[in-house]
């Protein structure tokens, strides 16, 4: 009755709610906020549930934070000297960098043509280990228009991330001691149709063990498309 469209997803941008560049949005999901700011070039802060709901009712949100140009400038230059072979490696990279920059705005250089899903994973990890709501990738994301003049400080902090940092992130996040598993769950953030297709490709001609549950978490629209 109030005009709401229930999406039930942490990735509304995969379900038709895709903000345009410079569009002001109010979302309460940290991984969605960093995606909107970084990949889409929209304007969003990390909202709480009550403030996002208030914005949906009033159509207004406080003008501060990442809604302002001056706060969207990078604080740190991140050099990458690690092999990023899979989407999981981007998660490990984001986890490592997020712990270092906290709530900063990292500028990544040396990243070779990442996919949207890889950037989605990078942003989600940055937002979880730190409080990153915006990042830039040189030559890739819409506001990363070169190093010159795009930093808050005259001499921003330069951070080199090597293979050891990525490996350490895997170690920190992999504390399982048992060799067997009961449940395998993928889809945090929710899987895109490309990620669902990749799982299907990996399982082609194979069967999941009857003692193991495989969960693929995604949105209703993506599931309908996959079906």
Regions found by a protein language model. Name each.
Residues 12-18, 142, 217-223:
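Short connector loops at secondary-structure junctions
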Residues 19-26:
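Glycine-centered loop/turn motifs
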Residues 18-19, 74:
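Short Asp/Glu-rich motifs
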């Amino acid at each position: 009755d109030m005009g709401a469209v229930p999406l039930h997803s942490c990735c509304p941008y995969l379900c038709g709610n895709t903000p345009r560049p410079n569009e002001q949005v109010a979302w309460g999901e940290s991984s969605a906020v960093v995606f909107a700011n970084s990949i889409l070039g929209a304007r969003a802060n990390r909202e709480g549930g009550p403030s996002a709901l208030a914005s949906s009712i009033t159509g207004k949100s406080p003008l501060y934070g990442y809604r302002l140009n001056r706060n969207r400038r990078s604080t740190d230059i991140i050099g990458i000297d690690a092999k990023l072979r899979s989407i999981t490696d981007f998660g490990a990279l984001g986890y490592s960098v997020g712990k270092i920059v906290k709530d900063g705005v990292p500028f990544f250089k040396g990243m070779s043509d990442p996919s949207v899903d890889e950037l989605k994973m990078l942003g989600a990890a940055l937002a979880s280990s730190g409080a990153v709501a915006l990042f830039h990738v040189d030559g890739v994301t819409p506001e990363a228009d070169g190093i010159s003049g795009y930093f808050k400080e005259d001499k921003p902090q330069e951070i080199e991330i090597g293979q050891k940092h990525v490996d350490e992130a895997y170690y920190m996040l992999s504390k399982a001691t048992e060799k067997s598993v009961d449940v395998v769950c993928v889809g945090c953030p929710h899987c895109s149709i490309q990620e669902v297709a990749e799982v299907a490709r990996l399982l082609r001609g194979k069967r999941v063990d009857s003692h193991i549950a495989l969960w693929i978490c995604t949105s209703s629209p993506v599931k309908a498309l996959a079906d």
